[in-house]
Amino acid sequence: MARLLVTGASGFIGSHVAGHLAASGHQVVANGRCLDRLRLLQGTAAQLVVADLCTDALEPLTEACDAVVHCAALSSPWGTAESFSRGNVLATRRILAASQRAGVRRFIHMGSPSIHFRFADQYGIDERFEPPRRWITDYARSKWESELCVRSAAANGLEALVLRPRAVFGERDQAILPRLMAIADRGWFPLVHSGEAVIDVTYVGNLSRLVAQCLEADVVADGRAYNVSNGDPIRVVELVTKLFAAMGREVRLVPIPRGVAVAMAGIAERIARVRPGCPEPRLTRYGVGVLGYSQTLDISLARRELNYAPAVSIEEGIERYAQWWKQHVHA
């Protein structure tokens, strides 16, 4: 079995990836910035190491590692360009350099299909991408720039793959499903475009298993990217209905035109920017766009080259999340 470094192991995706790899028998170094959250992995065989990828020496992390799985990122619909650049580009550049110096064989980078986002319906998006003249979010731009860093390292001899998972959810999720629940706290949920947008989501366990397969995948690891999802596009109204039912919540669904929702989000953003600390508003234009416009991915490349076969359905994934939430959050 291999010695592996998993960055971002104190986060949602990273903790699942580290736990799965450790359970599979690999020697895992689990890195994160928050010791309390890293302790979620204490029941596993993973070695827990606190370090900041932007400031600390990284050689102790990558030393003797066969592969690095880079899950660390600042992932949010709200934030400054500087913070996204630091958390997603600088951190990636530094861990790539440390990996190359340590002789790491393979580098797996967690990218994002948010780079494709437009205020327009898009179906069957493949991995080809041309950056826009103007980015809609600083987050998406930073994720693309981090991919360019990976490609550069691959051109210099490091085996590297990029995974672009769409809307990852599951146990310990702190972003996708909790945000939907928070919006519904008032007893009603705004269904942008009547919830008719068709989207892709990814259960975190399916992603974790794919990462394990990537470690030994017989592919040209030249920094190429792979779309990842559950491969089962679903309408937003169906998704939230399944979520609220699993959580035992009665929520009134209120259809709202896309234009009205975007305007409401714009007002919420302007209010947030003048408040102390510039807190994230409940509605953002990007968030409205994600729920109001269809975006589905073509995952045939991952199926063909990485033998990706998502085993856990959206319905089962939501049920697993609901059970975890009831046991650990709402107990």
Where are these regions (language model features)?
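Amphipathic terminal alpha-helices
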Residues: 297-305, 309-331
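Mid/C-terminal beta-alpha module of Rossmann-like enzyme folds, strongest
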Residues: 214-281, 319-320, 329
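Substrate-positioning beta->alpha
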Residues: 145-146, 174-179, 193-215, 223-227
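Catalytic helix-loop patch of NAD(P)-dependent Rossmann-fold dehydrogenases
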Residues: 90, 121-168, 189
